[in-house]
């Protein structure tokens, strides 16, 4: 018979951010005697839950999916765009072993470096800043033939906005005294994802054979001719860019090709056209045996070419680490946030880990939650308190959705009610944890209810915020709080409170030091 467990409980108050100003602040203006006393008397700190601290672009508000991924991973989990921006800013991009080896190989064998991708500042499939960094990397490492094959956007950017990008790269090549834009084509052809192989073939022939419907001396002239034909960026027909006397930029055996899109769905088809021996979408007039073909990120597991930035593997998330150490865990929330404390918290793993139980409480069936700001918190608290006292679990992770779901309605009075309801719930949870001689962490995944009106417009503020969130410790250990934390520090904090080893994959730091 196993001994009764003293659980460590993580309570996530969704949308419960920290803001000092009282105006339009449903959290500060609500009557919260329990949270007030905890904040005054218990070890506590504020932690970052937005922007680069959670792997989002700088200044971007946090969200529940990203928040829970970071909470469970114990490390910052970067989106591809942010990860690449950061790599370039820190200089690590320029020493990426896959990219540098591919360029060095071309330099050594006297071959061309072809760079292709969506030349756009849209940031959805690619970013031209990444392409610029790649051009600079190739030039710095001594590549003498650098050819940029520009796919034009007009979907994630205005329909006719490519000219500034083409001018920027034309100027860069002039400054380098080396390389050029070799072709332009609309994404409608190069980035099809619906097996319209007639479109892809036009792009493939342009790239491999320098064969296009149109030719121009320079990229801007080629674009202006397309506009004159009535083609917007997305639909620019295959155009070879080649001034009189210039060698063509067809792709040849031994050349290096680097594909600079980071989003996979619209690059799989054309990539397979290049690399699959058994490709049968259309008859390829020319099959190029590249020295190196590099995809920037992994476009598909079955595309067997080198990848500069493989997916960040989320091994040893908090839940998986508990399983490996034979610990029991419970995940509990209402419908609205159930996926967050399970799938997202587990780093995108759907199946529960061994020893992981789950309890789903149905959220109330109302049109909007301002009509029932307490949501299903009474039932959720009852089940949570029962689980804490059951002695079954080493760890319990619970999400209360009220602050976020009611915050999204923009109804200030309802948000105040939601926060006051939560205070009553926390009172019961604290009592249960103390009775079980356990430990409790109270935090949030991002802010919302602390800012219910937009000061700039005077309208209801229904979105998340970029503000920090509280972290409070209640328990049987004497601990000292550390400042400057973020969501990815919570999992290591929990492991240290349980006196467990922290896996090396977790780069977060414990925020409560046992004295």
UniProtKB/Swiss-Prot annotation:
Protein name: 2,3-bisphosphoglycerate-independent phosphoglycerate mutase
One cellular component (GO) term of this entry: cytosol
Positions bound to substrate: 125, 155-156, 187, 193, 263-266, 337
Binding positions for Mn(2+) 1 per the UniProt entry: 404, 408, 464
Catalysis: reaction(s): (2R)-2-phosphoglycerate = (2R)-3-phosphoglycerate
UniProt function note: Catalyzes the interconversion of 2-phosphoglycerate and 3-phosphoglycerate.
Catalytic residue list: 64
Gene Ontology molecular function: any one: phosphoglycerate mutase activity
Pathway: Carbohydrate degradation; glycolysis; pyruvate from D-glyceraldehyde 3-phosphate: step 3/5
PANTHER family linked to this entry: 2,3-BISPHOSPHOGLYCERATE-INDEPENDENT PHOSPHOGLYCERATE MUTASE
Entry-linked Pfam families: iPGM_N (PF06415), Metalloenzyme (PF01676)
